[in-house]
């Protein structure tokens, strides 16, 4: 228990670190960060499959299930999972390239069985902001410099109930919290194209909070005697994030060697008089449906679609020209294969081999160009530390964006590692 508290404290602190270097995190509340657990990501971000030893944050109905009723109903597994992420991105425009990387804490979750009920709690990221951008004038002098960091995280508590052998339902409540900071420096030059002693800087900070809910339904049933049909449905209604905003203007001295700027005079804008001190960000609803088929502890293949009405998103504080949000979707196809789950003399026969592919319309439109993302993934589920615990890995390779209309194309590699710990906490002792 003490170790769990340390992990929670560490994760909250680690969430202050940037997990993205994408220039597209400049828009909205940043790049959507959480795409599922390591297992989900290794199957093309597929979440329709559920089992007794892995958590599924995308559908709260997974917090219980008939596959938890093992050991003659006496030792249902308590599930704990923690994940880490490494990202490397090549940023390419029509005239230059750059490389960026980030390492971050990914997620933390605990799932407790309670008879036909199940309870889960955890901490996951939602969005991340992390960019440094420059724009130049006709003679290649820096005109503007933009920088942003922060993001939104979710702490959740959920419950599920096993209706029958085939159906389970669930819901969770998520508390959203975080902040986003961004700044812009405008560079001015004299007649000899030398930078002036003082430049002007605008800084914005938004502290965000709010609650949203997620509802889920899961089906699992036998067909053709030896195969299992899996179905899932999840819905998250639209909600508002409350934003407390602060804006300052300053004259700064810029050090071209260190890249740091030092404020000389700073003025805080009276946002309250502009009715912008406290604003509400309208967040979209989300609908997810998945279907798959497999043979228990042998193989599985499934597909999934997630739709988001991103066009309703609004932020009164910041209005960026030539950009808008449009409705978005995610298509996933993936699965896994286990050579021999019961093998005890050949280790690699018990390894889970996962792979998948996905396409996402992100919902961001810049200069009349829809920003899309495509990726392939694969990963392993490696038995570790006992019969039920395992280490999971995921490797994602993909592209986001375009070079058209003076935009940026990202080529990225995401590496995820997670630890799934499973144990029997509630066992009825028997004596002869």
Question: What are these regions, as identified by a protein language model?
Answer:
Residues 17-432:
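Subset of outer-membrane beta-barrel
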Residues 1-22, 432:
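Bacterial Sec-dependent N-terminal signal peptides
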